[in-house]
């Protein structure tokens, strides 16, 4: 934002303002504020053959994710078929495998960069920097046909997708425990294995595949249980709505320097989750405000912030909101840390 615009913006501190007597933002948006799942990814020293067979011993030493759940939340009905994934890494690649339980393996699409989720599919969403900008999506069906794209930001913030991005150096293979497109028999599952080179998802000269780094990651499985739909959306960690393009709700992928099978690291959450959830509640409230009145607001009272919301934050925290008609910047200073979490109208997240 330009300085002239910033100088005209209103600055409001939540702890000095009157707030409305209502349920509050955290309750209003609680379904979209669940704590994301996390995964600690260990190194592999084996040479990985990407054939979909998962024969390498290290795959069995890699931790398995939890079973996928409904995209709308943990309290929604359990998916009919089970899906789990595993991850590994080395200096060149992020390795992903998934096993999708499936009694009838079907895949009709054969051309790259068609809308693969019109078939049953498996999808990977990656944001190596965690800022919600310029993230990556890779989809494939049971034929191994790929749809890969990059998005400058989420659709909710006016984002654009770039199908021209073909993940350079991607290796991907599938295998079937059953038969493809044969309706009269009963299949068991199909398997995906892929290797994503770090150079394909690197924004600068620094390799994001590094012990201690934390990416944002999610998996999705689109399943057509009946012809004509609606489709089922089963995911590793739920976004709280039928929308995968909410990078703030993706899981945390933490890279360990340990080799898979040689010890374990505990996940270290990079954020104070109370402050993080507060920030994104403000973001969602601003989206609704703009949808209602055609403009953002600098008033936290208008957005619906309550004393109960504020009380969830660490002692010494404060909230700031700057807004013009079509832009906003929300921030939460996390008490006792000196860190400020910031998000703007584009969904760009920063820690200052």
Say what each PLM segment does.
Residues 281, 286-311:
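Short, glycine/small-hydrophobic-rich surface segments
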Residues 307-336:
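Exposed beta-strand-loop-beta-strand "reactive/processing" segments of non-cytosolic proteins
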Residues 1-24:
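Bacterial Sec-dependent N-terminal signal peptides
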Residues 21-291, 324-327, 338-340:
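Structural preference for beta-rich elements and adjacent junctions enriched in aromatics
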Residues 2, 13, 256, 347-348:
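In a subset of proteins, long, contiguous C-terminal domains/tails are tracked
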Residues 337-352:
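A short, surface-exposed beta-strand/turn
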């Amino acid at each position: 934002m330009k300085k002239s615009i910033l100088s005209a913006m209103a600055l409001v501190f939540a702890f000095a303002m009157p707030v409305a007597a209502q349920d509050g933002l955290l309750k209003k948006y609680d379904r979209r504020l669940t704590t994301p799942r996390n995964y600690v990814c260990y190194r592999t020293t084996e040479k990985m053959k990407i054939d979909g067979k998962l024969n390498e011993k290290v795959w069995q030493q890699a931790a398995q994710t939890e079973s996928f759940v409904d995209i709308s939340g943990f309290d929604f009905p359990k998916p009919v078929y089970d899906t789990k994934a595993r991850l590994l890494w080395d200096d060149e690649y992020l390795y992903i495998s998934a096993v999708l339980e499936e009694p009838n393996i079907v895949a009709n699409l054969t051309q790259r960069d068609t809308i693969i989720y019109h078939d049953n599919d498996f999808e990977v969403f990656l944001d190596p920097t965690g800022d919600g900008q310029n993230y990556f999506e890779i989809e494939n069906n049971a034929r191994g046909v790929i749809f890969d794209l990059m998005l400058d930001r989420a659709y909710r913030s006016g984002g654009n997708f770039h199908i021209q991005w073909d993940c350079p150096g991607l290796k991907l293979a599938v295998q079937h425990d059953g038969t493809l497109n044969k309706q009269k028999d009963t299949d068991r599952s199909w398997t995906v294995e892929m290797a994503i080179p770090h150079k394909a998802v690197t924004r600068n000269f620094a390799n994001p595949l590094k012990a201690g780094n934390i990416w944002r990651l999610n998996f999705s499985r689109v399943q057509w249980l009946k012809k004509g739909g609606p489709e089922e959306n089963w995911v590793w960690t739920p976004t709280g709505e039928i929308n995968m393009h909410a990078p703030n709700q993706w899981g945390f992928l933490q890279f360990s320097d340990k080799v898979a099978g040689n010890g374990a690291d505990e996940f270290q959450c990079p954020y104070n989750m109370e402050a993080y959830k507060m920030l994104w509640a403000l973001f969602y409230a601003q989206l609704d405000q703009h949808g209602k009145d055609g403009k953002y607001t600098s008033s936290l009272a208008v957005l619906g912030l309550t004393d109960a919301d504020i009380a969830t934050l660490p002692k010494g925290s404060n909230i700031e909101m700057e807004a013009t008609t079509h832009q906003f910047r929300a921030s939460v200073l996390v008490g006792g840390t000196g860190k400020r979490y910031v998000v703007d109208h584009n969904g760009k997240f920063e820690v200052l």
